[in-house]
Amino acid sequence: MGTLWSASANLEKKFHNLVLELHLSYINSGADVIITNTFSARRIRLIQNKVNEHFKYINEQACLLAIKAKNQSKKNILIAGSLPSQRDTYVEDKRKSNEIEKDFLDQASIISPYIDFFYLDVLSSGKEIDIASNVATKLNKPILVGAHIKKNCLLASGETITEVVEKYRNENWLGLIGACISPEIVEKSIDELREINLPFGFKANLWKIDEPGPQQTFNTAKFNEVGTNPNIAFGKRDKYTAKLFYEFSEKIIKKGATIIGGCCETKPEHIREISKLK
């Protein structure tokens, strides 16, 4: 359905078990944290796909399914609320601050009662990180910052991680990670991350290209069209095995990282391997 992607599974009850089973597959592989399926439930995506009237339901169901998975697993995991960029992914949101704040608050207010902390999910500018952090603080929730870093080790806004931390640091931050970035970019940026005086780490993706962006064809589908699979638009690294992911993660942990995980194209077997590093 257009650009709705994973949020379709929250909307249609026949797919709820898919979300539940996916959460459980990661929990049973050793994940300490699962993230609500709200990345594609941002309002702009629902407007584009003509389902904005279901905004509350789609976001609520994502949270309820995460809680159901936790309860079924009987494991003491945490639930992070995915609070994504409120426009396109991987690029800076250049709108006025009050417009960005309203969108963050609308989504965060629905998610907040169900979660342990907010995960700022792949944000691309200090301004967005600051606005989202202030929204989460108003809702009395801790925050894990997920900053998307490019090959030049800058955010899409042109800021360094150091600049973002120095200008916008919030007392409710649990830490800061490189979000949805390749293992190679993690390795390039890790020396700067280790100097920010916060818990740090990564959620690495296994896309074939280093710098994904909304210009790729998968994000242009109309509401009544089937979009290109991101695996085709971005490619995937089938040969990046769980063992390679373990070796990469071990190297980053030795640099001081304490928050590690997988993003797009990482699978339960990748998490199972890195869970051995606890």
Locate predicted features:
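Domain-level signal for soluble alpha/beta catalytic cores
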Residues: M1-K278
